[in-house]
C-alpha cells in the first residue's frame, strides 16, 4: 500500500510539473486528486506510513526537477492540507456517495472539493507572492481555481473506475454489442474538441458542451467522466498556453482564472446528468429484479417463470427439439408451518431453493 501511494503520487506529480507554463504553477496537477481517490477507495491506506510516503513522493518529484527545497516543502504542505481535508469530509459520506452513485453525489463532491481547495490555497497562496511577486489574494484565487479544476476533472474518473477485470469485460462487450449509432456521441465529442482547436477564439472551450451532454445521456458514468477529464485537461492546458486568445498585458492571471472556473462549471453539467442516470438505472434494475424474482427465495416469480417457459417451449418446438419438464413438491410443508410457524417455513423454502439451484447448476455444468 505504501509503495502504491508513493508510485501514484510521484508519477502524477511529475506529469503536473511537465505542464507548468513559464512563470506559473502547473496548469494541470493530478497528484492531489489521485491521492485523494486512492484514500477514499482504500481507506486502509490512510496510515502514518501512507501519508509519509505521499509526502516523500511530492518532495522527490519536485527536487529531481530542480525545484528549490524550501519552496518544495511549502508546496507539499499545501497539497497535503487539501487532500487531508477532502479525505476527512468524504469519510462522512455514505459509500454510494463516495462512488458518485446518487443524484446528489456530484453536488457533495463539488462542495468538498471547494473546501479542500480553500485549505490548500490558504497554505500555498503565499508561494505565488514569493515566486511571482503577486498579491496574496491573487495568489489565493489562482491556486484555488487551478486546484478546483484538477479535483473536478480527475476525481470522478478515479472514484468510478471499475476493476481491471470488469473494465476489460465492459470494453469487450461494448465492441461486440453496442449499436453503431451509439458511437455517434463519442465521434461528435472528438470532432468538437478538434473544432475548438482549429477554430479558436475566446469561446472555443465551450464548443464541446452539447457533445458532452449527449455522451452523458448515452454512456455509463465512468466513460462520461473520462470524456469530461479529456475535455477539461485539454482545454485547461490550451487556455493556459494562450492558444485560443492572447492575454492582455497584466491581466493574464485573471483571464486564466475566469476560464478555469468556466471549465469547472461546464464539467459539472454532464457529470451531474451521468450521476442521475446511474442512479436511475440502478433503481430500474432493482425494480425489474423485484418484479421478476421472488424476494424470499430469489427464484423466478410465477409470472416470469410462465413467460420464460412459454417462450422456451415455443422456440424448442419451432426447431423440433424435445423438452422435459418436472415438478417438485415439498412433502408435509404445511405441517412445518403449523408446527414451527411461518418463519420456519420461510427458512425451509430458502434452503430448498438454494439446494435445488446448486443441484441444477452442477447438472448443467456436467
Task: Give the residues covered by each predicted segment.
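Short aromatic-rich membrane-water interface segments that cap or initiate transmembrane helices
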Residues: 137-149, 255-258
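Juxtamembrane non-transmembrane "cap" segments at the membrane-aqueous interface
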Residues: 226-234
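Signal-transducing coiled-coil linker helices
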Residues: 207, 252, 257-296, 303-315, ...
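Conserved long alpha-helical elements within nucleotide-processing catalytic cores of c-di-GMP signaling
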Residues: 288-292, 298-324, 331-358, 366
Amino acid at each position: 500500500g505504501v509503495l502504491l501511494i508513493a508510485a501514484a503520487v510521484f508519477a502524477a506529480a511529475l506529469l503536473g510539473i511537465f505542464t507548468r507554463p513559464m512563470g506559473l504553477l502547473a496548469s494541470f496537477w493530478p497528484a492531489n486528486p489521485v491521492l485523494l481517490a486512492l484514500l477514499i477507495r482504500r481507506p486502509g491506506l490512510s496510515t502514518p506510513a501512507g501519508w509519509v510516503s505521499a509526502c516523500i513522493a511530492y518532495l522527490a518529484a519536485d527536487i529531481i526537477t530542480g525545484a528549490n527545497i524550501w519552496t518544495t516543502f511549502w508546496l507539499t504542505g499545501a497539497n497535503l492540507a487539501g487532500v487531508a481535508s477532502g479525505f476527512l469530509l468524504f469519510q462522512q459520506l455514505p459509500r454510494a456517495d463516495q462512488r458518485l452513485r446518487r443524484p446528489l453525489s456530484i453536488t457533495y463532491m463539488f462542495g468538498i472539493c471547494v473546501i479542500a481547495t480553500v485549505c490548500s490555497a490558504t497554505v500555498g497562496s503565499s508561494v505565488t507572492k514569493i515566486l511571482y511577486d503577486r498579491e496574496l489574494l491573487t495568489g489565493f484565487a489562482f491556486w484555488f481555481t487551478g486546484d478546483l479544476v484538477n479535483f473536478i476533472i480527475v476525481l470522478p474518473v478515479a472514484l468510478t473506475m471499475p476493476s481491471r477485470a470488469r473494465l476489460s469485460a465492459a470494453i469487450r462487450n461494448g465492441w461486440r454489442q453496442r449499436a453503431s449509432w451509439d458511437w455517434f456521441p463519442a465521434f461528435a465529442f472528438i470532432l468538437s474538441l478538434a473544432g475548438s482547436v482549429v477554430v479558436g477564439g475566446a469561446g472555443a472551450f465551450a464548443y464541446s458542451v452539447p457533445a458532452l451532454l449527449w455522451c452523458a445521456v448515452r454512456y455509463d458514468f465512468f466513460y462520461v467522466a473520462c470524456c469530461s477529464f479529456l475535455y477539461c485537461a485539454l482545454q485547461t492546458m490550451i487556455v493556459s498556453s494562450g492558444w485560443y486568445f492572447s492575454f492582455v498585458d497584466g491581466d493574464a492571471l485573471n483571464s486564466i482564472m475566469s476560464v478555469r472556473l468556466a471549465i469547472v462549471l461546464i464539467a459539472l453539467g454532464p457529470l451531474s446528468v451521468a450521476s442521475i442516470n446511474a442512479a436511475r438505472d440502478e433503481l430500474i434494475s432493482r425494480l425489474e429484479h423485484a418484479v421478476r424474482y421472488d424476494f424470499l427465495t430469489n427464484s423466478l416469480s410465477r409470472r416470469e417463470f410462465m413467460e420464460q417457459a412459454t417462450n422456451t417451449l415455443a422456440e424448442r418446438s419451432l426447431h423440433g427439439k424435445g423438452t422435459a419438464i418436472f415438478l417438485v413438491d415439498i412433502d408435509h410443508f404445511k405441517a412445518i408451518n403449523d408446527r414451527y410457524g411461518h418463519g420456519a417455513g420461510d427458512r425451509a423454502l430458502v434452503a430448498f431453493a438454494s439446494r435445488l439451484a446448486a443441484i441444477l447448476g452442477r447438472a448443467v455444468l456436467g
